[in-house]
């Protein structure tokens, strides 16, 4: 039972070890909850204004609630060049849930705002904002709170040149496996921190997750310290000896 059918599709040039190698956890949610969210934080054509777009999937199961409220807070450090503290509030009625139904029991609520001035994220200046999403019931009680770091950035290719926030960049990258010489595919957070700091000391600005999505914490570190990520899907086959 070491391998499944999927093992041969997700089969890279790699040490093939068995066992649970990343965090596994069980958690409970209220019947009405934040099922998922997706945030897109870009820049306008002049690379000054921030374009904040957020989609929140609200799961309410079989029974439509009468009224819900979503609150979204967005802010950065007070000492930032362009400090902001935004609070977006949206009251959600039964009809809103019906009109925005994604599938049975789940509806998507959208937020969008143009922010006059933002501190853009780049490898040289990895500016991040704190985003918090609160779901409240009809009495104003907090049902669930989730959050994420957000970086405003725009990536594009113009005239054959890769640009971030309108500025040309030179990729100085490495490939990285989720692998530790002592613990195999179980990589500690401390080792990830050591990896990323070593990369920065050698002026590396890009990492390729060869050949599969990495641990979630690794992406958080790349956001925090300023590394571009070439993220690969776990879809590659090789012969096994």
Residue ranges and their predicted role:
Residues 1-221, 225-229:
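Secreted/periplasmic carbohydrate-active enzymes, especially glycoside hydrolases
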Residues 171-172, 236-241:
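Active-site-adjacent "subsite" loops/lids of carbohydrate-active enzymes
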Residues 213-215, 235-238:
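Solvent-exposed loop/turn segments at secondary-structure junctions
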């Amino acid at each position: 039972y070491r391998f499944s059918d999927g093992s041969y599709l997700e089969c890279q040039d790699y040490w093939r070890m068995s066992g649970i190698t990343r965090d596994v956890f069980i958690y409970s949610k209220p019947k009405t909850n934040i099922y998922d969210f997706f945030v897109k934080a870009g820049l306008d054509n002049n690379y000054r204004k921030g374009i904040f777009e957020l989609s929140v999937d609200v799961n309410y199961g079989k029974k439509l609630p009468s009224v819900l409220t979503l609150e979204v807070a967005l802010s950065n450090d007070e000492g930032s060049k362009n400090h902001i503290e935004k609070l977006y509030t949206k009251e959600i009625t039964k009809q809103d849930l019906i009109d925005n139904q994604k599938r049975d029991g789940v509806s998507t609520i959208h937020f969008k705002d143009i922010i006059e001035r933002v501190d853009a994220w780049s490898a040289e200046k990895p500016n991040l904002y704190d985003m918090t999403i609160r779901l409240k019931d009809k009495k104003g009680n907090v049902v669930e709170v989730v959050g994420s770091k957000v970086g405003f950035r725009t990536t594009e290719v113009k005239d054959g040149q890769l640009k971030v926030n309108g500025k040309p960049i030179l990729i100085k990258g490495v490939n990285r496996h989720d692998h530790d010489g002592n613990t195999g595919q179980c990589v500690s957070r401390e080792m990830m921190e050591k990896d990323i700091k070593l990369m920065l000391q050698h002026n590396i600005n890009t990492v390729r997750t060869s050949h599969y999505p990495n641990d979630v914490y690794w992406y958080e570190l790349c956001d925090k310290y300023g590394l571009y990520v070439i993220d690969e899907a776990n879809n590659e086959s090789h012969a096994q000896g």
